[in-house]
Amino acid sequence: MPNRGVVLLDGQALAYDIEKDLKNKIQTITAQTHKRPKLAVILVGKDPASITYVNMKIKACQRVGMDFDLKTLQEDITEAKLLSLIKDYNTDQNISGVLVQLPLPRHIDSKMVLEAIDPSKDVDGFHPLNIGKLCTQKESFLPATPMGVMRLLKHYHIEIKGKDVAIIGASNIIGKPLSMLMLNAGASVSVCHILTKDISFYTQNADIVCVGVGKPDLIKASMLKKGAVVVDIGINHLNDGRIVGDVDFNNAQKVAGFITPVPKGVGPMTIVSLLENTLIAFEKQQRKGF
């Protein structure tokens, strides 16, 4: 149970409301155009976590009435064949967005694969062109998890402008794009990573702490400022079957002013942000007569 003084940032509830809005929009579009958005999902191999995440995305598509095309490929598929499939999706007028589930097998160059996706269908927001637009504050597809985090903070009227933000994790998927979004919103941002000597130096002085590195209980209550906003992006599957984040939730929530639970925090916002990007891609393609 959460501490009485802390506010839980309920991503599941917000995502549910956004899904209802998306469903209504798609129904209206379908009635008017006899077309609907379609997300292509590529899964390579049989990684259990990847299969789980893909299934969650497919179920979300079904809930809002969005079509999908799932391609499950053998782990030993050649890079050339994967790139050829992406090229086919790029030119397929029935496909609104293309998503390649990460991570990919070691013999495949992930950067090359992500760069092969048409930027106008890059609903994961990982293409260098879209990342570049993010950095220069031009309209682009935002990576789903950072997009979901910002949407969640906005929903709870959490001020970012002028605040000190500590981001733990510098990945291309979460940490780097989230730092740019925070910077664009007027925050002073510190990004910590594996070579950071003393993470607590940054977290103890931060108004907002965001962490997503995949290490249970990395962030302790003693590392937080009283009343801090704590965004836990980590997802860790423990041997006892529990799913936890990167924050010691039970103790951290006694110090924090706002905190995301795991699960039901950032995860649902990531998926619904992907759906939003796919709808945006569809609408842009329709305006261009694609």
Swiss-Prot record:
GO terms for biological process: L-histidine biosynthetic process; methionine biosynthetic process; purine nucleotide biosynthetic process; tetrahydrofolate interconversion. GO terms for cellular component: cytosol. It catalyses: (6R)-5,10-methylene-5,6,7,8-tetrahydrofolate + NADP(+) = (6R)-5,10-methenyltetrahydrofolate + NADPH; (6R)-5,10-methenyltetrahydrofolate + H2O = (6R)-10-formyltetrahydrofolate + H(+). Keywords: Amino-acid biosynthesis, Histidine biosynthesis, Hydrolase, Methionine biosynthesis, Multifunctional enzyme, NADP, One-carbon metabolism, Oxidoreductase, Purine biosynthesis. One of its GO terms (molecular function) is methylenetetrahydrofolate dehydrogenase (NADP+) activity. Catalyzes the oxidation of 5,10-methylenetetrahydrofolate to 5,10-methenyltetrahydrofolate and then the hydrolysis of 5,10-methenyltetrahydrofolate to 10-formyltetrahydrofolate. This is Bifunctional protein FolD. It comes from Helicobacter pylori (strain HPAG1). The lineage of its organism: Bacteria, Pseudomonadati, Campylobacterota, Epsilonproteobacteria, Campylobacterales.
